[in-house]
Amino acid sequence: MASQGTKRSYEQMETGGERQDATEIRASVGRMIGGIGRFYIQMCTELKLSDYEGRLIQNSITIERMVLSAFDERRNKYLEEHPSAGKDPKKTGGPIYRRIDGKWMRELILYDKEEIRRVWRQANNGEDATAGLTHIMIWHSNLNDATYQRTRALVRTGMDPRMCSLMQGSTLPRRSGAAGAAVKGVGTIAMELIRMIKRGINDRNFWRGENGRRTRIAYERMCNILKGKFQTAAQRAMMDQVRESRNPGNAEIEDLIFLARSALILRGSVAHKSCLPACVYGLAVASGHDFEREGYSLVGIDPFKLLQNSQVFSLIRPNENPAHKSQLVWMACHSAAFEDLRVSSFIRGKKVVPRGKLSTRGVQIASNENVEAMDSSTLELRSRYWAIRTRSGGNTNQQKASAGQISVQPTFSVQRNLPFERATVMAAFIGNNEGRTSDMRTEIIRMMESAKPEDLSFQGRGVFELSDEKATNPIVPSFDMNNEGSYFFGDNAEEYDN
């Protein structure tokens, strides 16, 4: 990362803005949120959704996916050049659920992409409002992070499934820009780089010619993004090596896996933002809330306040537990998939249980599932306290973590010891220590080994009462350290499949 002077807050990345003061940032983020809300209201009108149907999270997701698809330039171009049978490149759609005679029914809708782009631009003062689209992508990414595990993807790139806490944002599309890069975990970017290097090993022309030059620029840019996430000089120096390599190959892959592992203890900076489903913003706009005038922040109290008084419903499969479905969506709303469960439980005011103990599958419903057998219930998305979202990743304390996930990536800026099993992490570092990065590796391992509990617990602000909007009276919770800290412990979550 360049000097502090050029660092932009993520609200600025979010809105594509240059340096702004806090009020301007709040206003431009508010403008973006208001645009999403207005778009949602208009789509509900066009689709003739009742108030209840418009509050159904499954309908919200379908509408969100339609607008993302309508603006996916590269895919649209590809579809037009490679027509496939039965797919109209100019149309997009999905399942809309309607309540008919006391039963839920699924209706597959098709819409002109051009029409959706028109509605979106109209809701956003005639602009393309890319920031709003990215915001929706991050909400979908956070939902995926809470719902699925990425074991297969980790194993395929040579990483260890226990490193799942580094995989935030692993399903974000490439076009998600700076705001998307800010929320990606160290493992996610390492994995993208490893995939590039593997393609280069298998395809001699990958780095050659005009295309290869562009590829190289993308490679170096991604290296710089990853470098900017590390907080120690040795980790950054190692990233310089990876970036400057003439012909990236297995040595670089090794280095990247090493660096990703080191991030379990020497954590990277990963931003967290509360991105809510479009229907929540729609409800607020419909009730007269002026986001641009009031201002909005993705990392402060605002999303908590919004969720305190929004009623959102979800379809529930016959054997699912509605409380567990609520937990899943709550975690997604606050980007808390890799947060310590004790911290999440304290803030939420309800026990947050590990993924393996949840009796619920994902929020989205497959086309072959029988909707008539399903009921809908209110999602409980309220919280007892609020806390500022972190972007630092903090550092760690030697606490027991679990077999399934051996570290956490803090979401909330709350002081605590971090659960994590030093022995398990350090065991991964025996073996290969020669080659051009050996001195950096030695230095990194030394830092990891000497990490002392007291200087390394996460120094956060604490949590706040919901009435304490200016964050004046921090409450520092005390946690029972014998409790389970990780969400993906002993896990049986489904794999994420594109």
UniProtKB/Swiss-Prot annotation:
| Alphabetical UniProt keywords | Capsid protein, Helical capsid protein, Host nucleus, Host-virus interaction, Ribonucleoprotein, RNA-binding, Viral nucleoprotein, Viral penetration into host nucleus, Virion, Virus entry into host cell
Q: Where is the composition biased (Basic and acidic residues)?
A: 8-22
Record keywords: RNA-binding included? Answer: yes
According to the UniProt entry, where does the motif Bipartite nuclear localization signal sit in this chain? 198-216
Tell me one GO biological process term.
viral penetration into host nucleus
Chief location of this protein within or outside the cell: virion
Would the keyword Kinase be found if you checked this record's keyword annotation?
no
Q: Where is this motif: Unconventional nuclear localization signal?
A: 1-18
Q: Where in the cell is it found?
A: Virion; Host nucleus
Maturation and modification: Late in virus-infected cells, may be cleaved from a 56-kDa protein to a 53-kDa protein by a cellular caspase. This cleavage might be a marker for the onset of apoptosis in infected cells or have a specific function in virus host interaction.
Q: Which GO terms describe its cellular component?
A: helical viral capsid; host cell; host cell nucleus; ribonucleoprotein complex; viral nucleocapsid
Renumbered to this chain, region (Disordered) spans: 1-22
What family is this protein classified in?
A: Belongs to the influenza viruses nucleoprotein family.
The entry's function note states: Encapsidates the negative strand viral RNA, protecting it from nucleases. The encapsidated genomic RNA is termed the ribonucleoprotein (RNP) and serves as template for transcription and replication. The RNP needs to be localized in the host nucleus to start an infectious cycle, but is too large to diffuse through the nuclear pore complex. NP comprises at least 2 nuclear localization signals that are responsible for the active RNP import into the nucleus through cellular importin alpha/beta pathway.
Q: How does it assemble?
A: Homomultimerizes to form the nucleocapsid. May bind host exportin-1/XPO1. Binds to viral genomic RNA. Protein-RNA contacts are mediated by a combination of electrostatic interactions between positively charged residues and the phosphate backbone and planar interactions between aromatic side chains and bases.
Quote the protein name from its UniProt record: Nucleoprotein
Q: Which organism is it from?
A: Influenza A virus (strain A/Swine/Italy/2/1979 H1N1)
